[in-house]
């Protein structure tokens, strides 16, 4: 049986809840992609052009990550989970992918969003990291069944 890492970034807690459900359903190890400086509610105000998230996304600023995956060689598959920001992945995800060599790993992407499609996000990842093997992309809300999570990761 292959070993699966479920890595996630969650600023508001929504993606974390879904990642926990996915990890339980597929018997994966959970890993939080944690920014050195936590996000506040004001940081996440996408309507404010001066908010931290707006500045990071508009100026491609990649926040520092406090923790590291201990040994990626232990995993055959990596699930990468995050909320959609500005129709793409948050810049902390780019930082995570730059800092962790996932060459040869199958990377399964899922996102959380109230309404945005995963299409432009998935394309952004493929464009920014052409050497990685992105298997599939899925948008989850947290209302899915355990079977939905299991069948997605085949």
Predicted feature descriptions by range:
Residues 29, 103, 132-133:
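Secondary-structure boundary/capping positions in well-ordered alpha/beta enzyme cores
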Residues 108-145:
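Short, glycine-/small-residue-rich phosphate/pyrophosphate-handling segment
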Residues 50, 105-106:
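P-loop/Walker A phosphate-binding loop and immediately adjacent motor/lid segment at beta-alpha junctions
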Residues 82-83:
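Glycine-rich, N-terminal phosphate-binding loop of Rossmann-like dinucleotide-binding domains
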Residues 86-87, 115:
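Acidic catalytic loop of the alpha/beta-hydrolase fold
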Residues 1-77, 87-89, 94, 98, ...:
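N-terminal beta1-alpha1-beta2 submodule of the flavodoxin-like/Rossmannoid cofactor-binding fold
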Residues 72, 98-105, 129:
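Short, conserved loop/helix-junction motifs that constitute active-site signature segments
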């Amino acid at each position: 049986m292959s070993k699966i890492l479920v890595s996630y970034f969650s600023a508001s807690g929504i993606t974390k809840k879904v990642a926990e459900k996915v990890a339980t359903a597929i018997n994966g190890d959970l890993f939080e992609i944690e920014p050195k400086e936590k996000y506040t509610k004001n940081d996440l105000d996408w309507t404010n052009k001066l908010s931290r998230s707006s500045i990071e996304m508009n100026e491609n600023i990649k926040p520092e990550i406090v923790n590291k995956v201990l040994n990626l060689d232990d995993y055959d598959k990596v699930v990468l989970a995050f909320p959609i920001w500005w129709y793409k992945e948050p810049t902390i995800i780019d930082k995570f992918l730059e800092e962790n060599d996932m060459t040869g790993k199958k990377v399964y992407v899922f996102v959380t969003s109230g309404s945005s499609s995963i299409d432009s996000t998935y394309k952004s990842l493929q464009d920014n990291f052409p050497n990685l093997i992105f298997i599939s992309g899925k948008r989850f809300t947290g209302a899915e069944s355990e079977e939905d999570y299991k069948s997605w990761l085949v």
